[in-house]
Amino acid sequence: MGCNDKCGCAVPCPGGTGCRCTSARSDAAAGEHTTCGCGEHCGCNPCACGREGTPSGRANRRANCSCGAACNCASCGSTTA
């Protein structure tokens, strides 16, 4: 899977393998856990301006991540609150 806005990587992708999603097992109980090579969890929005782990009233939520209050990047602006 190539780099995209669901991996927490820079958009547009700078290239290389740093923005490719991979599956890794953290432990047997947790099962498959998908992470991105740049350190973010796939499914979270890629805002560099901050995230909130719980719903904040902003409509743009992915995999339990939502845009921080100060976010105005394209991913956060893709939906309206």
Curated annotation (Swiss-Prot):
GO terms for molecular function: zinc ion binding. The keyword Heme does not apply. It holds the Pfam family Metallothio_PEC. Induction: By abscisic acid (ABA). Keywords: Metal-binding, Metal-thiolate cluster, Zinc. This is EC protein III. It comes from Triticum aestivum (Wheat). Transmembrane segments: none annotated. Binds 5 molecules of zinc. May have a role in Zn(2+) homeostasis during embryogenesis. The keyword Cell inner membrane does not apply. Belongs to the metallothionein superfamily. Type 15 family.
